[in-house]
Curated annotation (Swiss-Prot):
Matching SUPFAM superfamilies: Ankyrin repeat, E set domains, P-loop containing nucleoside triphosphate hydrolases
Cellular component GO terms, alphabetical: nucleus
Comment on protein domains: The two IQ domains are probably not interacting with calcium/calmodulin.
Keyword set, alphabetical order: Activator, ANK repeat, Calcium, Calmodulin-binding, Coiled coil, DNA-binding, Nucleus, Phosphoprotein, Repeat, Stress response, Transcription, Transcription regulation
Organism: Arabidopsis thaliana (Mouse-ear cress)
Protein name: Calmodulin-binding transcription activator 1
Physiological role: Transcription activator that binds calmodulin in a calcium-dependent manner in vitro. Binds to the DNA consensus sequence 5'-[ACG]CGCG[GTC]-3'. Regulates transcriptional activity in response to calcium signals. Involved in freezing tolerance. Involved in freezing tolerance in association with CAMTA2 and CAMTA3. Contributes together with CAMTA2 and CAMTA3 to the positive regulation of the cold-induced expression of DREB1A/CBF3, DREB1B/CBF1 and DREB1C/CBF2. Involved in drought stress responses by regulating several drought-responsive genes.
Family statement drawn from the similarity comment of this UniProt entry: Belongs to the CAMTA family.
PANTHER family: CALMODULIN-BINDING TRANSCRIPTION ACTIVATOR 1 (PTHR23335:SF29), CALMODULIN-BINDING TRANSCRIPTION ACTIVATOR CAMTA (PTHR23335)
Domain IQ: 821-850, 844-873
Tissue localization of expression: Expressed in roots, stems, leaves, pollen and siliques.
Annotated stretches, region: Disordered: 148-227
Region (Transcription activation): 233-398
Source lineage: Eukaryota, Viridiplantae, Streptophyta, Embryophyta, Tracheophyta
């Protein structure tokens, strides 16, 4: 039975010897438990106020990300990505036990690949700002993890080590296994400290036999009486016995199995049978409190590992040659217990290749073979727990239920969310995985999920995505798995955590007040979230790839909090009361669930409007939930999505004065110059800057006005760098607000002075953008007039790029190419400037004209008779015979032509209707655009006059800068993960080939 305390404390309080830890950090990486202990007690250490300069190997630093943002700038040259600019910094999560507790970002040196840097910080929200950085030069590629002996503290010539009594076995061994996966050239001996004399007892009253000293000390476990008991089908163990006996018959393996074989007949025996082969026989197992194991040989652990390593391949081949069939374990109540000495072999046989997500190394298998007990369950890095009994407090008489394994696996769990809930909160749980059945068979079953001993129905949202509601449950960890409504597990078993405490129902009026605009928006938003559509069965297999990708993006944003702005969550939390903060957390869970549901639905999905004409993105912007913008965009909502009145999310954020939300929207590409729908009161519409200015948010108004000017110019000059020599070199004259940075603060600077400096820079930037836009408009108008005067209406196609390039290069001096062209033209003109050359040219031209006239006259005279015959024929047939007319008989060739009367003069009574020209519409639109540009420039200039507006503008620049840095780091992490998936050989963090070679036993056993 799994000990509850092994899950209760993620990071047990370790008594670290800092001097020894610092000395060991010179040649090995620290383990997650040690790092967690340091980060949780960071106030006891010195936090560096500035980044180091080229730190040496073995250096350890603590930084505060809120204080020192650029702690990674250490002067070293790290390995770059393909672009040659961004540092290739990969990311992983480290576990303590079965729970992710640490972020780990690691980088490799460019010149020296063995020199590495690892940055760690906690996943807990209140400790995320403390960063632990470790520099180390790894000696060699891989070394096995072994026990480090200390001869100075040995007794009778042997080293005796034990684990701190306060450390939970699960945490200790999990960290040991993590080192085997993620460490480079390190030894698992930090939490193991030398002891002058061996431990002979423990707090549970169980005393190990003398022969068990080494095993118990290595694992640090304590066997106690189990509250649950299982009955194992003995016939299923015959196959295992056949393989073990064949292995036992080998001469070089006799000694190894003899060392492992206990002599007590009350435990599991290994019998040899020459006819039927060896089999494992389950006898009566006594209580662990009354049973002691008498080992025939007190073998040292190192000797056993060496012997097992030498004979591992033979053992694997013998087991792999058997035709093993899957078998299951079912729960029964009789008080019978199974000794755990051979439980690891049974677990290996129960796991099929489909459910085996990650193979463990040989060191894990050897440790489990030596002495895994029932209250110590090793867990894989994916967080799935073993098939074992999990204690439940709901049992009245101390009897617990164990998950029952079905005959075959029908579903593979990749991830699920959320992984915890309050005891009385029936939250929705999303399970992402893969069905191992055909679509017809998937719809045939009634799928359910088990939370401990409670089975709840599940709904299929899309192929591979299930949704269920967690039932009310007592606090604690329970097994979680998928069933076919028969209480038998058809997937891997995971762990769900029920947290103590009750869910508080918070009303929107308690947070935002009564009869306020925010309370009304919140209530309408909650009403929208409550709206769900039923997913039909014939739709769950449509567009599976796109839907799963969107769901994966949403869940990734939910798990990764790195997209949050630095300090944004803390600032909002300080502004709100505790009830408001709790309401925000509850609302966040509902929002993510709603987005996943809408992604799987048919129709508009999340692009829907409520009864009053607002959508989800508009509510998010109006309420200031900037943390929800990226998940909403990941669900497929456009950032410029309009409501019924033509308002975008940026309009709502500016109208409500949400600084962080405005900065996030502009950084993500929202159109700052978008207009609302025209109305009788506002025939020209309003921009977001106009709405912010009307509500007194002058800083936001100036920020958006500058953004509209610079972004409009950026759209016109999107490709001008390639064709314009003016912009091909040098710094950009006009920067967008997403590219700008706030003025850095130095010693002696006053905040008012810095905000004034930023505001003046904004005025200069906006003035240059407006001036260039006016030049572009004037140039386009002038070129059109020239073409209209020439009459070449087909060539009235002036590109914006040409006009912008000309406007940008007007102030520049002509280059060397213009001088050379002028010289060439002058040389050509000089050749024909003399009277002699000109006379020859005129004579030649006159002769050519005469020749052309003779040729044309000859052609006309040659065709004259044919033309006369044709005209006569047509005159007789059509004009005379067909139309019964006179034909050409009365035609007079020398008759005077009839004079055309002149048109009457244009008067006010009868004006002439002007000819329609589509350019008139463009002129009117351009006139309105110029008025808006002038108004935007006025908004930016007026911002300088108010200190509050200048401070608000500086805060917006700071948020935009922080958002840009977080986006760069997160995109680099995602790209690194993609590159590592394609190029596994470049990843020095985990050696996949060595793990596969070590786990031949596990891979060879198939059901």
């Amino acid at each position: 039975m799994v000990d509850r305390r092994s899950f209760g404390s993620i990071t047990p309080p370790l008594q670290l010897d800092m001097e020894q830890l610092l000395s060991e950090a010179q040649h090995r990486w620290l383990r997650p438990t040690e790092i967690c202990e340091i980060l949780q007690n960071y106030h006891k250490f010195h936090i560096a106020s500035e980044s180091p300069t080229r730190p040496a190997s073995g250096s350890l630093f603590l930084f505060d990300r809120k204080v020192l943002r650029y702690f990674r700038k250490d002067g070293h040259n790290w390995r770059k990505k393909k672009d040659g600019k961004t540092i290739r910094e990969a990311h992983e999560k480290l576990k303590v036990g079965s729970i992710d507790v640490l972020h780990c970002y690691y980088a490799h040196g460019e010149a020296n690949e063995n020199f590495q840097r690892r940055c760690y910080w906690m996943l807990e929200q209140h400790l995320m700002h403390i960063v632990f950085v470790h520099y180390l030069e790894v000696k060699g590629n891989r070394t096995s993890i072994g026990m480090k002996e200390n001869n100075s503290n040995s007794v009778n010539g042997t080293a005796s080590v034990n684990i701190d009594s306060t450390a939970s076995p699960t945490s200790t061994l999990s960290s040991l296994c993590e080192d085997a996966d993620t460490g480079d050239s390190q030894q698992a001996s930090s939490v193991l400290r030398p002891s002058p004399e061996p431990q002979t007892g423990n707090r549970y009253g169980w005393t190990p036999a003398p022969g068990m000293r080494n095993v118990s000390q290595v694992h640090g476990n304590r066997v106690r009486e189990s509250d649950s008991q299982r009955l194992v089908d003995v016939r299923a163990l015959d196959t295992v016995g056949n393989s073990l006996t064949r292995f036992h018959d080998q001469p070089y393996c006799n000694n190894l199995l003899t060392q492992m074989q206990p002599s007590n007949t009350d435990s599991m025996l290994v019998e040899e049978n020459s006819e039927k082969g060896g089999r494992l026989k389950a006898e009566h197992i006594r209580n662990p409190l009354q049973t002691q194991f008498n080992w025939q040989d007190d073998t040292d652990l190192a000797l056993f590992e060496q012997s097992a390593q030498d004979n591992f391949e033979t053992f694997s081949s013998l087991l792999g040659s058997e035709n093993l069939q899957p078998f299951g374990i079912s729960y029964q109540a009789p008080p019978s217990n199974m000794d755990s000495e051979y439980m690891p072999v049974m677990k290996i046989l129960r796991r099929s290749e489909d459910s085996l997500k990650k193979v463990d190394s040989f060191s894990k298998w050897a440790i489990k073979e030596l002495g895994e007990m029932e209250d110590l369950q090793m867990q894989s890095s994916r967080g799935d727990i073993a098939w074992t009994t999990v204690e439940c407090e709901t049992a009245a008489a101390g009897i617990s239920l164990s998950p029952s394994l079905s005959e075959d696996q029908r579903f593979t769990i990749v991830d699920f969310w959320p992984k915890s809930a309050k005891t009385d909160a029936e939250v929705e749980v999303m399970v992402i995985g893969t069905f191992l059945l055909s679509p017809q068979e998937v719809t045939k079953y009634n799928w359910s999920c088990m939370f401990g001993e409670v089975e709840v129905p599940a709904e299929i949202l899309v192929d591979g995505v299930l949704c269920c509601h967690a039932p009310p449950h007592t606090a604690g960890h329970v097994p979680f798995y998928v069933t076919c409504s028969n209480r038998f597990a058809c997937s891997e078993v995971r762990e769900f955590d029920f947290l103590s405490g009750s869910t508080q129902k918070i009303n929107a009026t308690d947070v935002y007040g009564t009869y306020t605009n925010e309370a009304s928006l919140q209530l309408r938003f909650e009403k929208m979230l409550a709206h769900r559509d039923f997913v039909h069965e014939h739709h769950i297999f449509e567009d599976v790839g796109d839907k799963r990708r969107q769901i994966s993006k949403i869940m990734l944003l939910k798990e990764e909090k790195e997209y949050l702005l630095p300090g944004t969550y803390q600032r909002d939390s300080t502004k709100q009361e505790p009830k408001g903060q709790l309401f925000r957390e509850l609302f966040e869970e509902e929002l993510y669930i709603w987005l996943i549901h809408k992604v799987t639905e048919e129709g508009k999905g999340p692009n829907i409007l409520d009864e009053d004409g607002q959508g989800i993105l508009h509510f998010v912007a109006a309420l200031g939930y900037d943390w929800a913008i990226k998940p909403v965009l990941a669900a497929g909502v456009n950032i410029n999505f309009r409501d019924a009145n033509g308002w975008s999310a940026l309009h709502w954020a500016a109208f409500s004065g949400r600084e962080e939300t405005v900065a996030v929207l502009v950084s993500l590409g929202a159109d700052a110059g978008a207009l609302t729908d025209p109305s009788p009161e506002l025939p020209l519409g309003k921009t977001a800057a106009d709405l912010a200015y009307a509500n007194g948010h002058r800083g936001i108004s100036g920020f958006l006005a500058e953004s509209s000017l610079t972004s409009y110019l950026e759209k016109l000059t999107v490709d001008s760098k390639e064709n314009s020599p003016a912009n091909s070199c040098g710094e950009k004259a006009v920067q967008t607000v997403s590219e700008r940075t706030a003025a850095p603060m130095t010693y002696g600077d006053v905040p008012e002075k810095l905000s004034l400096k930023d505001s003046l820079t904004a005025v200069r930037n906006a003035t240059q953008a407006a001036d260039r836009l006016h030049q572009v408009f004037r140039m386009q108008s002038f070129q059109r007039k020239q073409l209209c005067d020439i009459g070449d209406d087909e060539k009235i196609d002036i590109s914006d790029q040409l006009a912008v390039s000309f406007a940008a290069s007007k102030t520049k001096n002509p280059g060397q190419g213009d001088v050379s062209l002028s010289c060439a033209a002058t040389h050509i003109q000089k050749k024909y400037r003399g009277w002699k050359k000109r006379k020859e040219f005129l004579l030649i031209r006159q002769r050519i004209v005469k020749i052309q006239a003779h040729v044309r006259g000859h052609q006309v005279r040659k065709q004259y008779r044919t033309v006369i015959w044709s005209v006569g024929l047509l005159e007789k047939i059509i004009l005379r015979w067909r139309r019964k007319g006179n034909g050409l008989r009365g035609f007079k060739r020398n008759a005077v032509a009839k004079t055309v009367e002149p048109e009457p003069p244009v008067s006010a009574i009868c004006p002439r209707i002007p000819q329609e020209d589509e350019y008139d519409y463009l002129k009117e639109g351009r006139k309105q655009t110029e008025e808006r540009l002038q108004k935007a420039l006025t908004r930016v200039k007026s911002m300088v006059q108010y200190p509050e507006a200048r401070d608000q503008y500086r805060r917006l620049l700071t948020v935009v800068e922080g958002f840009r840095e977080n986006e760069a780091s997160s995109s680099a992490s995602i790209n690194n993960k993609e590159e590592e998936a394609v190029n596994c050989e470049e990843d020095d963090f985990i050696d996949i080939e060595s793990l596969l070679n070590d786990d031949t036993l596990m891979m060879s056993i198939s059901p």
